[in-house]
Amino acid sequence: MKNTFLCVIIVIMAPFAGCLDSFTSGDSDFYPDLKQRHQLDWNMTHTYSRILEDGSYYALDVQEAYIEVDTSDVWETGPSESEIHLSYWLPSNTLEGEKVPVIAIVSPYFSYGQPTDESSDTSIVSAGRGEFIFENFVPHGYAFAQVAVFGTELSTGCFDYRGNGEGLGIHNAVEWLGSQEWSNGHVGLYGKSYEGATQWEAAAQGSEYLKTIVPISGTTALHPLLYKNGSAEARSQVMHMAYFSSTVDYNPDDLDNICPDIVEGFFAGPATYGAGEFDPYMDNYYSERSHIDKAFNNWKGSVYFVHGMQDWNVDPHQIFSGPDGTPWYHQYQDAGYDVRGMIGQWEHNYPDQWSKHNAQDSGYGAEAIHNMTRWDWAQDLFEWFEYYLKGIGPKPDMHIQVQRNDGQWRVEETWPSKDTQKMTLSLSECQTSGVFVSGFAVVGGAAQQTVNLDCPAFSELNDTHISGLVKLHLYSIAFFDGGQIFAEMQDSTTGMRIGHATMDIRYHAGGSEPQTVVPGQELTMLMEFQGIDAIIPAGHTIRIVLTETGEDYLAPLCGNACPVHVVPSMSNLIVPHITEDIETFITPQSVDAANNQ
């Protein structure tokens, strides 16, 4: 009898064996394979991508919560208690008592702007990123929350721009969302730019409820956002106050939003710009606002890194730089974190934001627009959230999807690839015009003296696929304790920009640690280009243009007093490049997006 019963069970279960196997073994048949997605029918009628199959649930009416937070130990003169305000929507399956995970956007941008021109509050699904989560994921049984950081919208307390207070408020919101009776205890965060920074702030606090983050061009630390090897972006002087002025309502209630860090932030920019190695703010203001390093030590969740390779608002160095020159992407992978990535040639946009994937100049992503938009992004993210927030489906592949400058997509284990070859080009091989770099101390000031290096082709016979962080080791002679070089690499055959690097000579060793430089000192500036993934045709020659400033960087405060003498004959360009066959795939594209020039 027992044997007969066992046989019956085996026969009944046989049709489900493949499903069980795909769940437990990571069988790709559970979802469409990445390489086959372009063959499927995608909903391309929106301004954002859609999951392949619509969910069956609907959103219940919006609810709100005020979370009281003890802030007595975080601000010197701020309120001892503050409130975080959030709004949230539950899916209809919670009516039957089903517990659900939460996807949240944490932001300063609710009720943001001047009183007569504010954005919507948390109780209204935000345009773009909010609609994307609400329309795609609530029908699949996810709760959705919008959280206002301290000092914004209806959240009280100080507007502590990416400081400890802001992180504490975010942490309490995550804890609240994860501990509600309708919650399954799994929280994921989503968002771009500042809304990516808030994810790292949450991760730095180490909540056990926070299972995964998906920062889109997310800021990982404030100092490297505003300064690249000491070179200051123009916005570095006003960031804290610019945000504060757009979050207050200009009434007596604003007094609670003002804390010492706001005043400190007002002085931090100019002090760091001019003081270099004497900067008093590195050890307090900026270190407090570095989060990816704290998350590395305090948190054990998963990360889906998404970034635009042509994003100069939050540049790719936010994830592809790191301690001792090791990219943070590698650091997290090597430490055992579940890490996945997607890097495309878009600017400061989402992967599926097709209406913004346009008006990019040559060398700034224009050559990739025809194949740029990821209409499969919602599905890709759905598979990620299903696994990390619900425990459904196979574990996603821990790879990174990379787009080259000509639009081609491929899969790598990591980026920069650890298997690249290094090509060293001595600048002594280049025809040189000029040896001094100097200019005016104004934003984008016209350079008085520049250096032009016209170099031979990387290869006369084969295309060169640059992939990674190109290094420029520039032997230089200082005239002052200051001075700056902005380097742009170009395909001189076509005139196309390839990439850029910038450095204050006091930061010649790389990173964020300045050193005093004396007049006449000879040194090597260890410059590193922003991440490049580009194909250079065989026989195309290379030009390197050295100026005092470029893009949106400030010229050095010392102006004409600090020219830099460059010695090309003792300088090198080190180029990481791929020499082996790569695994490429085709992405689904709409006619409108593919021709969105």
Place the predicted regions along the sequence by residue.
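Glycine/threonine-rich phosphate-binding loop and adjacent beta-strand/alpha-helix elements that clamp
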Residues: 29-52, 61-72, 377, 389-597
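Short beta-strand/loop motif that positions the catalytic acidic residue
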Residues: 299, 305-307
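A catalytic-pocket lid/entrance helix-loop region that shapes and gates access to the active site
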Residues: 165, 190-259, 309, 316-320, ...
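Accessory cap/linker subdomain of secreted extracellular hydrolases
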Residues: 30-42, 51-53, 79, 123, ...
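Short beta-strand-to-loop junctions in surface cap/lid or active-site-entrance loops
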Residues: 85-98, 109, 289-293, 530
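Cap/lid segment of the alpha/beta-hydrolase catalytic domain
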Residues: 95-178, 354-368, 487, 551, ...
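N-terminal cap/lid segment of alpha/beta-hydrolase-fold proteins
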Residues: 46-98
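Secretory targeting signatures
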Residues: 1-30, 597
